[in-house]
């Protein structure tokens, strides 16, 4: 079967992403083994609601006659006016600025290191931007293994810690950084089993195991201003907000106005603590708000009863649903109040939503810029930005990395990174704090590092030399 634009990523060993079938995900709570042995703490799973079946009373049925079973279906509420379903404007004057694929060479990079994680795909790689002490530390997810490294000045890596799940069939798809109440770094990861592992890197022990999703978890993000809050995007079509400090499931986003297929990506707003983005296989990008339910977020910190008794709330309607792509949307990020989103259409879009104040349910999408990415037509290929969102790096299926200058119009391609030895699809990139180092993880189990080339400045001649 040839590759198509709607391929499933592989979660099985030695299976190509375009040929893999979606695995079944058993709901078992497995422990994970750290470099120092520790026990896992599992929060109880959220019970699935069942549709009740009621029989008519004996007074309404004749004696000896078979009684009918009446199935009561829940009523579906209408979409509220506050939810805007927007599409892009088309026509003269609505054209987006498209970047050129000719590199400007504003910054030049060279390959400085290659590290082999294993034989299974490395699906995730991310720097720790939550604490200035750890800006040069990054984490990776490869099969059932999580690893943390430090970027050294000579272009090399220093392995700090490594964690191995007891279930060797686990395949971690996402990894993120969080913090506990004392500021210790927490490593948060999840994958095919749907169980979220929270590891305290300072104590080298399991901090929490969060159970609640009914399918694999595709992405986890922590809130920049409150890193003990995380959101998780799942195959079960829902997004969940967790407090990793207490292990409480606070909010569940999904339902009538939620995603209609697997959720692939999420991202917290950098300055608005209430809003976040989500995207998925239903070709949409949605903006959600937690403002009306923030009291439950605050309550989750002081909750002393069992986590299963916490009054978890369900949020069914997003603020906005953007139908801007015609295929799977696997990555999205905020750029201020603008949105960057990527589908399997060989480009990244920068857009904003325009709604009417008198009628928030009406409006349109204004596509501002397009960042072309050739040979990027398979899903689960995620881009990343530096700390200040000045530049963006995205890999493709041929092993090339495109580095774009984000905050210019039209977009400027800073560099195109390639190496003859990189022949596998790049699943995710990681850009360092200042953009001087770019990392990429590949389908064949490798991590590649590019570092900026320093060009010595020519000395200014003195008056005597003149």
From Swiss-Prot:
Q: Where is the composition biased (Basic residues)?
A: 1-10
In the record, biological process GO terms are: cell differentiation; embryo development ending in seed dormancy; endosperm development; flower development; heterochromatin formation; negative regulation of transcription by RNA polymerase II; seed development
Keyword Cell cycle carried by entry: no
What are the alphabetically sorted keywords of the record? Answer: Chromatin regulator, Developmental protein, Differentiation, Repeat, Transcription, Transcription regulation, WD repeat
- Tell me the segments the record calls region Disordered: 1-71
Q: Name one GO cellular component term.
A: PcG protein complex
Q: What top-level branch of life does the organism fall under?
A: Eukaryota
Q: Where are the WD repeats?
A: 167-209, 212-252, 258-298, 324-361, 374-414, 421-460
Expression sites (tissue/organ): Expressed specifically in seed endosperm.
Question: What residue spans carry the Low complexity bias annotation?
Answer: 31-49
Q: Name one Pfam family in it.
A: WD40
Q: How does it assemble?
A: Interacts with EZ1 and CLF. Component of the polycomb repressive complex 2 (PRC2), which methylates 'Lys-27' residues of histone H3 (H3K27me3), leading to transcriptional repression of the affected target gene.
Q: What else is known?
A: The FIE1 locus is imprinted. Maternal inherited gene is expressed in the ovule (the egg and the central cell), while the paternal inherited gene is silenced in the pollen. After fertilization, only the maternal inherited allele is expressed. The gain-of-function epi-allele (Epi-df) plants exhibit dwarf phenotype, defect in flower development and very poor seed set. Plants silencing FIE1 have delayed embryo development, reduced seed set, and reduced grain length, width and weight.
Question: What's this chain's function?
Answer: Polycomb group (PcG) protein. PcG proteins act by forming multiprotein complexes, which are required to maintain the transcriptionally repressive state of homeotic genes throughout development. PcG proteins are not required to initiate repression, but to maintain it during later stages of development. They act via the methylation of histones, rendering chromatin heritably changed in its expressibility. Together with EZ1 and CLF forms a complex that is involved in gene transcriptional repression by trimethylation on histone H3 'Lys-27' (H3K27me3) of target genes.
Which family, according to the similarity comment?
Answer: Belongs to the WD repeat ESC family.
**Name of the molecule in the record:** Polycomb group protein FIE1
| Phylogenetic placement of the source organism | Eukaryota, Viridiplantae, Streptophyta, Embryophyta, Tracheophyta
What would be the name of the gene that encodes this protein? FIE1
